[in-house]
Amino acid sequence: QSFMSYSIFSVITLIVAGYLIDKFTSRKLLIYMNIPLFLGTLVIIYFDAPQTAFLFLGLVGISNGLANLLGSSTWAEIYGVKYIGSIKALTTALMVFATAFGTALFGFFIDAGFSIEKIAFIAAIAIACSIALLFTIRKKLNPVYL
């Protein structure tokens, strides 16, 4: 049932994000993409009621909705559309690798006896670092057009 909140928030975000991209550009929205995911990890860390799964998955749905649209439009804004196929192929390959690596890493943490709260804390640190990095380089995300 909690996956319904993921689906609902993901679809709503897809609809709203399309409008926001047209209004503000992908490059400006990119830095905010992982903030809901970061908040979701905080939900896991600080709350343990079963109902928090709805909130967590809703926040993940928001980040995923943003990622689905920003994944293509940002590259097109920065590099143009001439090489978008090659760029998407590379980023998809990296995503598949990261998914496999992340699964193995989380499995390692679980086997090592880490609680879900500790794993979420480690993830929150990594996400916070990525958000901070994006805020740091946001003015350098200018079009390159090869």
Regions found by a protein language model. Give the residues of each.
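A membrane-interface helix-boundary motif in multi-pass transporters
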Residues: 108-126
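Multi-pass alpha-helical transporter architecture, strongest
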Residues: 71, 121-146
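Helix-loop junctions at membrane interfaces in 12-TM secondary transporters
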Residues: 46-56
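Intracellular juxtamembrane helix-capping segments at the cytosolic ends
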Residues: 66-79
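Helix-to-loop junctions at the C-terminal end of transmembrane segments
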Residues: 13-25, 110-111
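Residue-level signature of mid-helix packing/kink "hotspots" within the transmembrane helices
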Residues: 7-15, 96-100
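A late C-terminal transmembrane helix in Major Facilitator Superfamily
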Residues: 81-113
